[in-house]
Amino acid sequence: MDRPERCPNCDAELHGVFCNSCGQKNESSRLSTGEIAGGILEHVAELDLPIVRTVWGLTVNPGRVCLEYVAGHRKRFTNPMKYCFLAAAILLAVRAWMGSGGVNINLSTIGNPDTAMSEFASEIAQQTTSLFSQYLNWFNLLAVPIVALMLWGVIRRNRKTYAEHLSFALYVYGHIFLLKAILIVLDRPVPIRLTVFIPYLTLVYLSWAAWGMYRRSIWWSMLYAVLMFITFILMIVIFASILSLIILAIRLVFG
């Protein structure tokens, strides 16, 4: 192979396999088909291996992934915030594709539907439900830092920082979003409603992840999981209530 004496990329003098200036590999100056194919495989591996390793690790041993990331092994795994946002985007796309809003709020039956007040309440409820379905993923993402804040306030024994609790919450809830997306897809062809198991699977997964991350007994881990679950649901309810109040205020002011 005819290797160049100077780097074709930055024109620096070459002394080895890689350029000391820009890092480009010292290969033949003439482009070959093998080089193109090898470059594709190299870049695919660089792009996909961390995400594949993260997905697999969070599936089989979520606590270990979180501990290793916190300990400094960050090159091996996808950034937790990036992972959570990516999983939320996948869940949003699946819900749009499958026609699943993910919520079933029915407040239109309050009171007597023949009265003006009931009609007004029904209209507010419908608008709230519609907007809530549209922004549910954002509410999910906003709830995760609050869950991490709760963990930071409750689990003081191991002296973990808020950022470490946040990385744990982002990873586990990101993976829960991904598992939800898979269950929504599988819900159509399977004769039983798989989505009804989501709350139970969430509690089991949170308990398992907390047990691996915080190294406490299974009972403490289950308690942390229940607190995480309640905090997350409570924040979603609060966000929905705030949204309803905003819609009500707009209707009262502008008619």
Residues covered by each model-derived region:
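Membrane-proximal intrinsically disordered regions of secretory-pathway and membrane-system proteins
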Residues: 1-255
